[in-house]
Amino acid sequence: MSNEFFALDSEGGDPIWYLQVLMTIKASGDKTGGALGLLDFRTPAGQTPLHIHHKEDEGWYLLDGRVSCTCGDETVSATPGAFLWLPRDVPHRLRFETECHLLQIAIPAGLEVFHKKMGQPAPRIELPPPGQALDTEKYKRLAAEHGLEIIQLPQWDEQEARK
């Protein structure tokens, strides 16, 4: 772990393709002394699984697009400039109603390690080609290792898993 100053320009970070998402790790635990992870997300329309983080709280700042967020029993719609706070141990899901650009902060750091293990280095700074299949066994195993509880996969993932 490090607790030294660091800075990235707008092109800096570690870009990853994870299913249909381009995520760029802007700050990881090894750069922030474990305090937080910050990722830049670019997504097509779609949704995350219904899941619970047991190790970190999660915040999202929406830069572009429309998102519907369910956290516990509440559902809200978000537009650019909105901030969503998802506390640990509460089930939640994001539905990206359009292509979206968001910043994700995880406190403490560690969630970025899960994303890096699930994804692959992005050869280009653009959304991955459509049709990336989810390896559900790897996903569930890594999720459990990183304190994530998967309650329900998105329907398109469930259909892929049955093939």
Predicted region positions:
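Glycine- and acidic-residue-biased ligand/ion/polar-headgroup-sensing regions
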Residues: 55-67, 72
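Hydrophobic small-molecule pocket/channel-lining residues, especially in calycin-type beta-barrels
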Residues: 67, 82, 116
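A contiguous, mid-protein "functional segment" used to position or interact
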Residues: 99-146
